[in-house]
């Protein structure tokens, strides 16, 4: 009986130790336990995925703008970027790759590939509106990234050799697209993501290098910071 008692105590102590160890591992993940289960999800294309960060033509998520944001935020930042995605493909992924992550914050950075592929602006707008509708539950903070400036858009036409296009008309349509989405929905616009990046820290004509993605992350963070600070989500 004495031996059985010693054995039983050992089992109990072992179980207690395992419970504490499991709790420690669960909490020791760079997040604060009070926020466990909520995330930031970055839905996007190659600019979110980290295309060209370290090697031109290849994706390196460890040097993407979501990875750099993670250094500043105390809840997980999920990179839901896939190179080449249009808004149609992004919309298709919302349920499986955004809502499934229980996001508190969603950053939508889509539209560049629609622009390159000359997808009708009305289609792009409808897709972005449907993405917002799916994501918006009344509690989530939603950010919409404007992927261009007028000057950059003009340069992109040159990069892709586009000549049979009314440049100013298409830029005006995209400006109206973003303005209307922001005015009609509870979303915050992120502009000037290319500040300090475009033409300086680039791996190819349209993608940043690692340093460029870090600067881009800082540009995005500057817009997120008031909300993050107000909700105690900063590291």
What function would you assign to each model-found segment?
Residues 28-83, 93-102:
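Serine-esterase "nucleophile elbow" of acetyl-processing enzymes
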Residues 2-13:
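Bacterial N-terminal signal peptides that target proteins for export
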Residues 23, 78, 143:
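Conserved Rossmann-like nucleotide-binding pocket used by diverse enzymes
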Residues 51-52, 88, 117:
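Short N-terminal helix/helix-N-cap motif within the alpha/beta-hydrolase-1
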Residues 82-87, 166-168:
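Short, flexible loop segments at the rims of nucleotide/cofactor-binding pockets, characterized by
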